[in-house]
Design a protein with these regions (language model features):
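Short, positively charged and aromatic/hydrophobic N-terminal segments
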Residues: 7-12
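A short, internal acetyl-CoA/4′-phosphopantetheine-binding micro-motif in the GNAT/acyltransferase core
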Residues: 114-122, 150-155
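Conserved acetyl-CoA-binding loop-helix of GNAT-fold acetyltransferases
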Residues: 123-139, 162-166
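Conserved GNAT acetyl-CoA-binding A-motif
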Residues: 138-160
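Conserved catalytic-core motifs of GNAT/GCN5-like acyltransferases
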Residues: 149-151, 165, 169-188, 200-201, ...
Length: 228
């Protein structure tokens, strides 16, 4: 899958400044690059993910995986689904990917989406840009439903707020499931929500899902940009 390496898109930051953008360094380019992840990104992506494991309930994982294990996760996702990385000034600042929602054939038109942004760069539009490109690629694959599994709580605390639920609602997701006291971390119990966004038409003669490697060349341009 070496042909994934140099494919990217450029996202222009909006001229209208937000509070988060004001926190950006004055010399930082107002340009975001989103590209397909490489296995070599594992260490940088893990550096973003690890604090979510160690200090939040956003992920139910307890132990930080090794770089080699994380590299394997990237490789596994790219065998069938998109795994995207966001960069600011050449530095990775976030990532998003899709994975199988159900391992039975009838559920193949559904995916589970995941997104993580460097914690000191939230509010800059990174997550929205990643999700936007992810959704467009999934549509090309004939995926119909994007599902997000979100840790949530009745009482917000230092480990978890319900900001992710509000964010996904803003992106067009709707609540479809709620599980009570099903996650135990930091000696506390937390809930779990499933949110869904339909991105395609459900028909009787449904076109098959196309694996991500099969569409990569179709969405690329001469300079390696993704045509989305």
């Amino acid at each position: 899958m070496t042909f994934f390496t140099d494919m990217f898109i450029i996202v222009r930051m909006k001229n209208k400044r937000t509070g988060a953008e004001d926190r950006m360094n004055q010399n930082e380019k107002k340009e975001m690059k989103i590209r397909i992840a490489k296995e070599e990104d594992a260490e940088a992506l893990l550096a973003i993910y690890a604090p979510y494991i160690e200090h939040t309930v956003i992920t139910y994982e307890y132990d930080v995986p090794t770089v080699e294990e994380f590299r394997g996760r990237i490789r596994h996702v790219l065998e069938r689904y998109p795994y995207l990385v966001a960069e600011l000034n050449g530095e990775i600042c976030g990532y998003a990917y899709a994975s199988a929602f159900h391992d039975r054939p009838a559920g193949g038109w559904n995916v589970e989406t995941s997104i993580y942004v460097e914690q000191n760069k939230k509010g800059m539009g990174i997550g929205t840009a990643l999700y936007d490109k992810l959704e467009k690629i999934l549509k090309r694959q004939n995926i119909l439903n994007m599902n997000a599994c979100i840790a949530c709580t009745e009482i917000e605390d230092e480990y978890l707020t319900n900001a992710s639920i509000r964010y996904h609602e803003h992106l067009g997701y709707r609540m479809v499931g709620w599980f009570t006291n099903c996650g135990y971390k930091f000696h506390r119990w937390y809930n779990l929500a499933w949110m869904e966004k339909e991105i395609g038409e459900h028909v009787a003669d449904q076109p098959p899902v196309i694996a991500f490697p099969e569409i990569v060349r179709d969405i690329s341009l001469q300079n390696g940009e993704l045509r989305l």
